[in-house]
């Protein structure tokens, strides 16, 4: 789970924490937790309670999604059994070319890339729709979902 903690995600912190919590509680998954702004922080040692962890850590600042996904790519051992879950508004500060390049690399490895877009406190989607369309065109699953919708989607994917 790769969670955008940049300044633009401030209104989505609660949503992001709940979404990360859904994946962390799935017993069939070995879950890693990575947060990022322009820096990447691996919080995999705190994945048992991602809601508390994400609510207590707020990085803020800029956004380097490509850098975070590049780090996550190094964690992939078995691509065909790997879900890379990105929770972000997809507003990339480090250049969209790099974001698309690393996303394509993850997808072409056989791993599944899931981009869960930001929802604010009223569940209104707030994300870069062009970036979302580009990722979807590459084969990533891109969705603006409530936690209930996500739980159903993940159950269908892994079940």
Enumerate the predicted regions with their spans.
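Residues that scaffold, gate, or flank divalent-cation-dependent active/transport sites
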Residues: 4
């Amino acid at each position: 789970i790769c969670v955008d903690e940049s300044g633009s995600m401030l209104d989505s912190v609660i949503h992001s924490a709940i979404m990360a919590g859904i994946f962390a509680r799935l017993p069939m998954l070995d879950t890693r937790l990575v947060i990022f702004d322009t820096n990447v922080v691996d919080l995999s040692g705190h994945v048992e309670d991602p809601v508390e962890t994400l609510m207590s850590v707020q990085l803020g600042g800029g956004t380097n999604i490509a850098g975070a996904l590049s780090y996550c790519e190094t964690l992939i051992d078995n691509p065909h059994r790997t879900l890379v879950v990105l929770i972000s508004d997809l507003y990339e500060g480090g250049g969209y070319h790099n974001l698309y390049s690393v996303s394509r690399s993850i997808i072409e490895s056989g791993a599944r890339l899931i981009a869960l877009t930001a929802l604010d406190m009223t569940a209104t989607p707030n994300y870069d729709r062009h970036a979302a369309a580009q990722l979807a065109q590459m084969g990533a699953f891109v969705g603006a979902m409530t936690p209930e919708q996500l739980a159903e989607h993940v159950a269908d994917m892994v079940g």
